[in-house]
Amino acid sequence: MKRLFVNFMTFAAMATALTFTACSSDSDGDDNGNGNGGNGGGTGSSIVVGENILSGTLTGEQTLDAKEYILNGTVIIADGGRLNIPAGTTIKAREGFSSYLLVAQGGKLYADGTADKPIVFTANTTSPVSGYWGGVIINGKAPISGSKTDKSDTALTEINNDYKYGGSAADDNSGSLTYVKICYAGARSTADIEHNGL
């Protein structure tokens, strides 16, 4: 009974801390010219291009300002990279399957909102629909289901075979998400390939 109570309390704490919202709309959508702009942006210690465009690969540590940003194509937090997103930040993703934030193995995402100032990932359009953009994908090093007895199996993401996930580090840590809303994610490239991230 004590173990059941501890498991329940652990689950309740996680559910309270992680506020993921799947948003949907009955609208047919309108991309307003916000198509996927590619990934020609920053690399290294900054993924911010200009005033508010997020693009490229982060290999160092970066803290965003609490304001609105546009996610332009694929943004990757590479091994050794760390992205800190403060409370009250909104990130609007451009439309498309290639528009997503991926935390590679060894990368870290700290998105710590509050009840009054959540962090919002959403579509960059006035007429959003479910599946408008990819979402947030975290590729950790923890064992994956159905893995070998030694729990060392890894797999490759369907969306980009350059990035593996899984392994044998049961205590792996890819960061923290608290009071985060992720809306209109889950884009598909075909009937069989879609984003299944957060």
Q: Which residue ranges define each predicted feature?
A:
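Bacterial N-terminal signal peptides that target proteins for export
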Residues: M1-T10
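Generic detector of short alpha-helix boundary/capping microenvironments
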Residues: T10-F11, S168
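C-terminal motif of bacterial Sec signal peptides marking the signal peptidase cleavage site
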Residues: L18-A22
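Beta-strand/loop edge motif enriched in small/polar residues
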Residues: S24-L198
